[in-house]
Structures are given as structure tokens and as C-alpha cells.
UniProtKB/Swiss-Prot annotation:
Pathway: Lipid metabolism; phospholipid metabolism. GO terms for cellular component: cytoplasm. Catalyzes the reversible formation of acyl-phosphate (acyl-PO(4)) from acyl-[acyl-carrier-protein] (acyl-ACP). This enzyme utilizes acyl-ACP as fatty acyl donor, but not acyl-CoA. Belongs to the PlsX family. It comes from Blochmanniella floridana. Gene3D superfamilies: Isopropylmalate Dehydrogenase. It catalyses: a fatty acyl-[ACP] + phosphate = an acyl phosphate + holo-[ACP]. Its main location: cytoplasm. GO terms for biological process: fatty acid biosynthetic process; phospholipid biosynthetic process. This is Phosphate acyltransferase. It is found in: Cytoplasm. Keywords: Cytoplasm, Lipid biosynthesis, Lipid metabolism, Phospholipid biosynthesis, Phospholipid metabolism, Transferase.
Length: 344
């Protein structure tokens, strides 16, 4: 049997091994062809592994690390002090050929910087972008990028994001000729910042991209586009606002606290909402789509939410598997070469 091998930064995130280790075992139980290289402090990880099914432990290898990248470290500082950290070792396992992808819930800036340093960028890509597939009203998925890797983006970067997002939509969501839109404050061509308007003009000239113009944030979940492109500042705020709202709605719809002042009204809402509608709300649970692709790199790197629980981190591991199986980095490189946009 040919295994798919992933390297996991076991020490990253708000909860570290308390979440990443149980999630690793859950992923191994779900995917028989998966092997995991768990990078972290053996003294912390081994006690957590005690009691788990030995059958799954056979497909898990513990790779020791001496330190961890702190969440509050600035990217430059984190990179400078990254030697022997769980994050860097996990990335170097890809470089050495021992792993096919990496998953980390650690410091986003450090992960991007170290990935560029260790994994390298695809020719023709200036900066990697954090990318996620979000469910929408029409029961499909919208690829949205960038979600926070790049606060400022020029028009060239936005065009590159559009190309990468199109490939991801085709390969992961299975959409033929995906629609691409730019996130903006209005649908009129005159709206928005200069970089957005310039990117729009360029996208209109690329026949292989199905560019449909601007989309406003209130249409994100309406299924009006398959790929939504924006800078990391707008994307991160949009995503977190949506996730916060959905967590609030889901918590209200699933509350069982009789003393809650809203309980009576919530119960009435539950009775009014049919099962189909309720299921659509449940599908928007952020835990179900945890794991952002750091696209633009020569290998797959997945960034999990720092506060992810066990099931959410398991989802991030699954996302990494999908990307490896569908050869996303290779497909992006092929698309860039075909479009003659690579840098010489």
C-alpha cells in the first residue's frame, strides 16, 4: 500500500498537543492510507498518546523538536529563532522528501515566512496567499483568497491570486470554468482602490479566466462567484466577521439553557425553521472548513485556526490530503506556464 505522508507541527496553536495529538489519531482512524510525522516535544506528546489504539500508532512517527514558534513573535524574529522549532522541522521534512505536505496551527506570519524560505515559491508567484473554500447558499463552495497572508497587495498579486484560486476551484470544488470576482465596495467599475481597478482591467484581458467583475461582501455566501479575490486585510476581516456571526447563530440555535432570556424565541425559531434550512446553517460551522491552503508554494502547506478543536484540526489534515492527491502546486505551476506569466 502506498501511503500519503504528512508532517504536523504538533506544538503550534492555542492548545498545542492537547488538540493536535488526538486530531492526528482521529485522522489516522479515518484515512487508512495516511501516515503522520508528528513534530514536537516527546515529553509532552508521549503521555497523550498513551491509551490510544496501537493499530493507529503504527502509522505515526514522533519527530522530536526542542522549541516552538511563539504566537506573539514577529515574523522576522520567529524566522531568525526558528532553528529546531516544530514548525521549521515540519517544513524541512517536505524539503527533504520525507513528507508531502505540512499542517500547522502556529504563527501565521512565521509559517508564511518559513514556507517561502524552506519550500520556495512557484515561478511566477510573488507571494503566497491564504485560501479557504467556504460553503454558500446554493450548496456549493466559494474559494476566497487572500485571508491574511498579505495585508497590502498590488494589482499583479491580485491577478496571480485569481489564477491560483481558479485552479483550486477546479481541482478541489470540481467546478469547470469557475467564475472569478474581486471583492470591492460596489459593483461599478469606478469603485474601489487603484490596485483593485487595475487588477480588474487585467483580468478582463485574460481569456482563460472567467472574470465576472466585482462582488460585495454581503454576497459572499450567495453563490454568485466561485472564486473571490481580495487583499489579506479585507479577506481576514470578512472571514472572521462571517465566522463570528455563524458561531453566534449556531450557539443560539443549539442552546438548551431554559434560563436564557432568548430561549422562548429561539425555540419558536427552531420550530419555524425546517430541517433543510437548519442543516444549511450547520454547514456554515467554521469547524467544518478549517484549514487554509497557503497557495503559491512548491508544496502543500495548510494553516489551521490557532484556536481549532480536535475535529477542526482533523479537517485541516484532510484538506492537506486533498491538496496532495490533486497535486495543487503542480497544477498551479502548469497553469502559469501555459499562460506564459512565469518570470524568466
Amino acid at each position: 500500500m502506498k501511503y500519503l505522508v504528512l508532517a504536523l507541527d504538533a506544538m503550534g496553536g492555542d492548545f498545542g498537543p492537547k488538540v493536535t495529538v488526538p486530531a492526528s489519531l482521529e485522522a489516522l482512524s479515518l484515512h487508512p492510507k495516511l501516515k503522520l510525522l508528528l513534530v514536537g516535544d516527546p515529553d509532552v506528546i508521549k503521555p497523550i498518546l498513551d491509551g490510544f489504539n496501537v493499530k493507529y500508532l503504527r502509522r505515526l512517527t514522533l519527530i522530536p523538536s526542542k522549541s516552538v514558534v511563539n504566537d506573539n513573535d514577529r515574523p522576522a524574529q520567529a524566522i531568525r529563532l526558528s532553528k529546531n522549532t516544530s514548525m521549521r522541522i515540519a517544513l524541512e521534512l517536505i524539503k527533504s522528501g520525507h513528507a508531502q505536505a505540512c499542517v500547522s496551527a502556529g504563527n501565521t506570519g512565521a509559517l508564511m515566512g518559513l514556507s517561502k524560505l524552506v519550500i520556495k515559491l512557484i515561478n511566477g508567484i510573488d507571494r503566497p496567499a491564504l485560501t479557504a473554500l467556504l460553503p454558500h447558499q446554493k450548496q456549493g463552495k466559494t474559494v476566497i483568497l487572500d485571508l491574511g497572508a498579505n495585508i497590502l497587495c498590488n494589482d499583479s498579486m491580485l491577478v496571480q491570486f485569481a489564477i491560483m484560486g481558479s485552479v483550486l476551484s477546479e481541482q478541489i470544488a470540481g467546478i469547470v470554468n469557475p467564475r472569478v470576482a474581486l471583492l470591492n465596495i460596489g459593483s461599478e467599475e469606478t469603485k474601489g482602490l487603484d490596485n483593485i481597478r487595475c487588477a480588474s482591467k487585467i483580468l478582463h484581458t485574460i481569456p482563460s479566466i472567467h472574470y465576472i467583475g466585482y462582488i460585495e461582501a454581503n454576497d459572499l455566501l450567495m453563490g454568485k462567484t466561485d472564486v473571490l479575490v481580495c487583499d489579506g486585510f479585507a479577506g481576514n476581516i470578512t472571514l472572521k466577521t462571517m465566522e463570528g456571526m455563524m458561531r453566534l447563530i449556531l450557539s443560539l440555535l443549539t442552546t438548551s439553557e431554559e434560563k436564557n432570556k432568548l430561549y422562548y424565541f429561539i425555540r419558536k425559531i427552531k420550530m419555524w425553521m425546517n430541517k433543510c434550512v437548519f442543516k444549511q446553517f450547520v454547514q456554515l460551522n467554521p469547524d467544518l472548513y478549517n484549514g487554509a491552503y497557503l497557495v503559491g508554494l512548491r508544496s502543500t502547506v495548510i494553516k489551521s485556526h490557532g484556536g481549532a478543536n480536535k475535529h477542526a484540526f482533523t479537517k485541516a489534515i484532510t484538506q492537506a490530503m486533498y491538496a496532495v492527491e490533486r497535486r495543487i502546486p503542480e497544477k498551479i505551476a502548469d497553469r502559469l506556464n501555459t499562460m506564459m506569466l512565469y518570470k524568466k
